[in-house]
């Protein structure tokens, strides 16, 4: 499984339990504990990757792989460490369902961010997918806002670093 697919698998498989935990603790409202559409930006499928109709989903997370760095920590170069940098774009529309609630979009965005951060931090010491693909460490980095008030679109860009250690070289 490639790295972006592994990250999407991690998010999808751990979303519901972490959302439930945040609702139970009172950190987010149950109305904002929705399951987002997680999209690999490289996909060519219709309404995924290239153009996404945000009205179809309560929230969207678009995953980008920014870079990969390889280190050879031994004198013999027989193993390598890999570090991957990702950007996750969280997108939420402030729509008509909000009624008179002027903070609906901001509250939904905050809830999605808190769930995503909890998912990633809960697996900070590693995640293994069903096919054996694995990250040994995950680090949530910076967050920046990415809003478009004219389109009623709220968003965050979240950086993430994932590491794999001691991969043998054939």
Please provide the spans of the model-predicted regions.
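Oligomerization/assembly interface segments of phage tail-like spikes and tubes
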Residues: 78-96, 151-166
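General helical secondary-structure elements
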Residues: 38, 44-47, 87, 104, ...
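Short, cysteine-centered beta-strand-loop-beta hairpins and adjacent loop/turn segments enriched
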Residues: 69-73, 93-100, 165-170
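Small/polar-rich, solvent-exposed N-terminal microdomains that initiate assembly or binding
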Residues: 1-77, 127-131
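Extracellular/virion structural assembly segments
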Residues: 77-83, 91-121
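Acidic-leaning, charged glycine-interspersed low-complexity segments
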Residues: 19-30, 60-61, 106-165
